[in-house]
């Protein structure tokens, strides 16, 4: 145990060393206030750094987006790729179906075939989803055109196309084909068609009158020649008309002349040449007028049992009646006048036509035609009156004395028979 004196000695020694401690403590102090402070050494305190970064305030932010991986889609581009429908077409020959009686197994085999193809084409989707995507993509225009192209490739080639190809090859071997020869008339027609008038463009439409927009017909070859002096024809037309009139006159002079008159309005039984001009009535018109007069007189004489259908008789024996002398004279005068008019018309038609009178002949012909029509009307009226008087005389004679009728029949039978025979011969020549 240490004594008290020893402890006191230790304290005294420690007090003596106190001055050294102060000196040592103040040794680092510098009284220069302008001295630079030396930097403190950096502290590598990792634990402190971790504590400060807990909230992430001092950490730098990265605002750039990271590139995403490309999203694979089942679109028309993927279907038309090598793994798409082209691969399906190559795999199709390997699919074998058994047919009738194996429908279930064939359907399962077909579904597995498509599932294998879709798993390789688009493995991301299930089989049902992939089928729906393929169906939706198949309605696009690109897929439709591609499908139609594949269908056309499978169709057999038409015989016409093969013939055309053979002909093309043959033409290439023989040489260039020459164009077919065309007649000159068709070339002229084609040129005329190309020179037809065309509708003017919009620039010319409003530059001139609005009515000039209508195409004008090409009158170079189809329009008739225009007359220089209004209604007066030019020299070429007049020469053509004169030449035509001369040709007609020459043809009429070469024809055989009319036969001599036989003393009857019906002629001599031969068919007369029809006149070409309308200067006088021809035989056909006169025959038509006579037939019309007879047809008009038939209804009035239908109730009379003895009267014939015509004033000239029908060639059969009939019971005649006595007619007064005045009626016979009127009838003879009427027939003579008709014959004279017929002969005058024939003579006028036989005369040649003067070419200089072509222009004024139409007016005179129209005037003569109107006069002849009036004469024909008068002739029809006179003949109808004569037939009516003859019918009345026949009715009166039939109701007279039987002896008078017998005498009349025996006295005039011979003459009437001859007249009837002559009339029948003339009618045979006409009709």
Swiss-Prot record:
Biased composition (Basic and acidic residues): 42-51, 400-416
Keyword DNA repair: yes
Highest rank taxon of the organism: Eukaryota
An example molecular function term from Gene Ontology annotations: DNA binding
Biological-process GO terms, alphabetical: DNA repair; DNA replication checkpoint signaling; meiotic cell cycle; replication fork arrest; replication fork processing
InterPro entries: Csm3, TIPIN/Csm3/Swi3
Chain residue ranges for the region called Disordered: 1-20, 32-51, 191-431
Biased composition (Polar residues): 215-225, 251-265
Record's keyword terms, sorted: Cell cycle, DNA damage, DNA repair, DNA replication inhibitor, Meiosis, Nucleus
Compositional bias (Low complexity): 1-14, 381-392
Annotated localization: Nucleus
Start-end of Acidic residues biased regions: 325-342, 417-431
GO cellular component terms, A-Z: replication fork protection complex
Quaternary context: Component of the fork protection complex (FPC) consisting of TOF1 and CSM3.
Physiological role: Forms a fork protection complex (FPC) with TOF1 and which is required for chromosome segregation during meiosis and DNA damage repair. FPC coordinates leading and lagging strand synthesis and moves with the replication fork. FPC stabilizes replication forks in a configuration that is recognized by replication checkpoint sensors.
Record-linked PANTHER family: TIMELESS INTERACTING-RELATED (PTHR13220), TIMELESS-INTERACTING PROTEIN (PTHR13220:SF11)
Family: Belongs to the CSM3 family.
Protein name: Chromosome segregation in meiosis protein 3
